[in-house]
Amino acid sequence: MKVAIGIGSAYYNGDDWNELVDYTVAADTMGVDYVWSAEAWGMDAVVPLAYLAAKTQHIKLGTGIMQISSRVPPMIAMTAQSLRTVSNNRFVLGLGVSGPQVVEGLHGASFAQPLAR
C-alpha cells in the first residue's frame, strides 16, 4: 500500500511554512511514499516541491495538479525536468485542467475547451 500526504492551497493556508516543512520531513523519515502539492488560490504547486526536495531524501514529490491553463507546454516540460533534477528523480508530474473558477477568475483565461490548448 502506498501512503501519501497533501500540501498546497487545499491543505495549507500559508500561516506557518516551517510547520509544513517539518511535517513533510517527518513523513519522509517515517517512510511516507508521496507528497502531493496542489494549486488553486494562493500557492502554486511547484515552488514548495523544489524547497522540499532539498529537505527530504526519499519521499516522491508530485504535482496534484499543475494547471495547464496557466503554463505553456515548453515551460511545463522545463519545470518538470528541473524538479526531476533537483529531487534526484523523485518528481512525479500531475497535470490537469483545473476549473472555471480558477482558470477564469484567477488567471483571466477562458475555460472553454480546456484540453484544446
Task: List PLM regions with ranges.
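Generic secondary-structure boundary/loop-capping signal
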Residues: T56-H58, G62-I65, G108, A112
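N-terminal beta1-alpha1-beta2 module of alpha/beta enzyme domains
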Residues: M1-L61
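Flexible, glycine-rich active-site loops centered on histidine and acidic residues
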Residues: K2-D16, S70-R117
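Structured beta->alpha junctions
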Residues: W41, I65-I68, V72
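Short amphipathic alpha-helical segments at helix-loop
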Residues: D33, G64, V102-L106
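Glycine-rich loops and low-complexity Gly/Arg-rich segments
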Residues: T29-V32, I59-T63, T85-N89, R117
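Structural motif
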Residues: S37-A38, G64, G94-G96
